[in-house]
Amino acid sequence: ADKLILPGVGAFPDAMKMLDEAGLTEVIKEQAKKKALMGICLGMQMLFDKSYEFGETEGLGLIPGTVELMHPANDLVIPHIGWNSLEKNEPCKLLESVNDGDYVYFVHSYAAVTDSKNVAAYCDYGMKVPALVMSGNVYGCQFHPEKSGKTGLGILKTFASL
């Protein structure tokens, strides 16, 4: 394959354990040095250094930062489930077909904590949530592009064309 997609639904510690047991952790790290990689939802979270979901678990370390429980303002509940709009932050090829205000679909309780330079787009859910992150040829969508209609398909098509 000339690109990799790391999907994920579930808990960070379990997912990392499964990658480790399958011998895939180092394979993914090595492949990410030479191929475009996209993490989706939990797959995005696993790109970071570590997560604090159910304790502390090391991630893949491909994007600097951590993953922490969200604390939204305005009594918003978690998990954050539903449609939310994107606000562009840093230039990113994956967002070429996306406009500020385009909606994508989220399902998550944890969010990345990383330097703003690694965030291509945020969403607002009572806090600024990194929605699309990047570092070199490694990208991550906290939202589900495959469930996000025209906007999500545009992002996936752009990734496929890299």
Question: Predicted regions: what is each one?
Answer:
Residues 3:
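Short, Asp-centered acidic motifs that coordinate Mg2+ and/or phosphate
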Residues 66-162:
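Amide-donor transfer/coupling interface in amidating biosynthetic enzymes
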Residues 10-81:
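Cysteine-nucleophile active-site neighborhood
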